[in-house]
From Swiss-Prot:
<comment type="similarity">
    <text>Belongs to the dihydroorotate dehydrogenase family. Type 2 subfamily.</text>
</comment>
<feature type="binding site">
    <location>
        <begin position="62"/>
        <end position="66"/>
    </location>
    <ligand>
        <name>FMN</name>
    </ligand>
</feature>
<dbReference type="InterPro" id="IPR012135">
    <property type="entry name" value="Dihydroorotate_DH_1_2"/>
</dbReference>
<feature type="binding site">
    <location>
        <position position="86"/>
    </location>
    <ligand>
        <name>FMN</name>
    </ligand>
</feature>
<dbReference type="InterPro" id="IPR013785">
    <property type="entry name" value="Aldolase_TIM"/>
</dbReference>
<feature type="binding site">
    <location>
        <begin position="111"/>
        <end position="115"/>
    </location>
    <ligand>
        <name>substrate</name>
    </ligand>
</feature>
<feature type="binding site">
    <location>
        <position position="139"/>
    </location>
    <ligand>
        <name>FMN</name>
    </ligand>
</feature>
<dbReference type="GO" id="GO:0044205">
    <property type="term" value="P:'de novo' UMP biosynthetic process"/>
</dbReference>
<comment type="function">
    <text>Catalyzes the conversion of dihydroorotate to orotate with quinone as electron acceptor.</text>
</comment>
<dbReference type="Pfam" id="PF01180">
    <property type="entry name" value="DHO_dh"/>
</dbReference>
<feature type="binding site">
    <location>
        <position position="66"/>
    </location>
    <ligand>
        <name>substrate</name>
    </ligand>
</feature>
<feature type="binding site">
    <location>
        <position position="297"/>
    </location>
    <ligand>
        <name>FMN</name>
    </ligand>
</feature>
<keyword id="KW-1003">Cell membrane</keyword>
<dbReference type="InterPro" id="IPR005720">
    <property type="entry name" value="Dihydroorotate_DH_cat"/>
</dbReference>
<feature type="binding site">
    <location>
        <begin position="318"/>
        <end position="319"/>
    </location>
    <ligand>
        <name>FMN</name>
    </ligand>
</feature>
<feature type="binding site">
    <location>
        <begin position="246"/>
        <end position="247"/>
    </location>
    <ligand>
        <name>substrate</name>
    </ligand>
</feature>
<dbReference type="GO" id="GO:0006207">
    <property type="term" value="P:'de novo' pyrimidine nucleobase biosynthetic process"/>
</dbReference>
């Protein structure tokens, strides 16, 4: 409710400034227990996926908390799970500013952040300090200076360092803002990457006596043939989940809007049809063998339910949260809970 009045003021600020201010305000509210009090009244819809019990199926997508500095506060908003990152082995500044652009008429964003983060070692320290229990995953990527032929080393480095502190790890091979990264979605690179990471997973499971699922995050701009190739490799290597989708290079539906020509990945409402199509195609190839996490253009409970009906097991929010505020989480969970009760004939 408060966010409705704050948003016009926040949108007058440069997007990264507004982002930092919002997160710092969230930390202040958390210190005064307002979030904890809100969470006590929050509806729950427990969902078991990948052998993990999620309090509800609505998660936070990677990108909002790149360095894991606000995990307790974000879990306090009522998310069933949060994903931090993307993180790389070494710190890197990302692309030059400005690198986030609003398209309010389309309820969309364009970003070209470029995996800016403080490095995996810093994130591990943040994970050690967190106090709130909850499901936390980490999105991992490669450093800008790492050639594709050695990209697997960056993913393996991050996976090993994070393994004992997280509930799952997402392999990000689909950001449009790191040159050549999306080539890792091709069979040539992906088969080798998955082979190496699954070998590491087996070794680390023996070492830590826990299994950390591996998810794969893919782009919305893939052809059906490319999606089928990825699905086949995911099945062959027994990847535990697929996150669909990342931001898009397309500008469909936004072409004439201010900032639409800025380079970067498009997120928000225009992405929803693409996300839905990819989820449907993935589910047609995977069935129920590999769960799908849907992200992209979710602004309502109806959006979330549509993606679940199409085959997704969980959903994630990002741009919808920026436009609608924290109440969106509660609204979606309530809608999904009522939808299930209606299907089960519960009055």
């Amino acid at each position: 409710m408060i966010y409705r009045y704050l948003r016009p003021w926040l949108f007058k600020l440069e997007p990264e400034t507004a982002h930092a201010l919002t997160l710092n305000c969230l930390k202040w509210f958390y210190c005064y227990w307002l979030i904890n009090r809100r969470l006590q009244r929050f509806p729950q819809k427990p969902t078991v996926v990948f052998g993990i019990e999620f309090p509800n199926p609505v998660g936070l997508a990677a990108g909002l908390d790149k360095n894991g500095e606000y995990m307790d506060e974000l879990l306090g908003l009522g998310f069933g799970f949060i994903e931090v990152g993307a993180v790389t082995p070494k710190p890197q500044p990302g692309n030059s500013k400005p690198r986030i652009f609003r398209l309010p008429q389309a309820r969309a964003l364009i970003n070209r952040m470029g995996f800016n983060n403080l490095g995996v070692d810093y994130l591990v320290e943040q994970l050690k300090r967190r106090k709130v229990k909850g499901i936390v995953g980490v999105n991992i990527g490669k450093n800008l200076t790492t050639p594709l032929e050695k990209a697997h080393e960056d993913y393996q480095n991050c996976f090993e360092k994070l393994y004992s502190y997280v509930d799952y790890v997402t392999i990000n091979i689909s950001s449009p803002n790191t040159p050549e990264l999306r080539q890792l979605q091709s069979e040539r690179y992906l088969a080798d990457l998955l082979t190496r990471l699954k070998e590491d997973q087996r070794r680390l499971e023996d070492q830590y006596h826990k299994r950390v699922p591996l998810f794969l995050k893919i782009a919305p701009d893939l052809t059906p043939e490319e999606i089928q190739t990825i699905a086949t490799l995911a099945l062959q290597h027994r990847i535990e989940g697929i996150v669909a989708t990342n931001t898009s290079c397309s500008r469909q539906g936004t072409e004439k809007l201010p900032n639409a020509n800025e380079a970067g990945g498009l997120s928000g409402k225009p992405l929803f049809p693409m996300t839905l199509q990819v989820v449907k195609q993935l589910h047609s190839f995977l069935g129920d063998e590999i769960p799908i996490v849907a992200v992209g253009g979710i602004f309502s409970g109806e959006n979330a339910q549509t993606l679940i009906n199409a085959g997704a097991r969980l959903v994630q929010l990002y741009t919808g949260l920026i436009y609608e505020g924290p109440e969106l989480v509660k609204n979606i969970v309530e809608f999904l809970t009522l939808s299930r009760q209606t299907r089960e004939g519960i009055n």
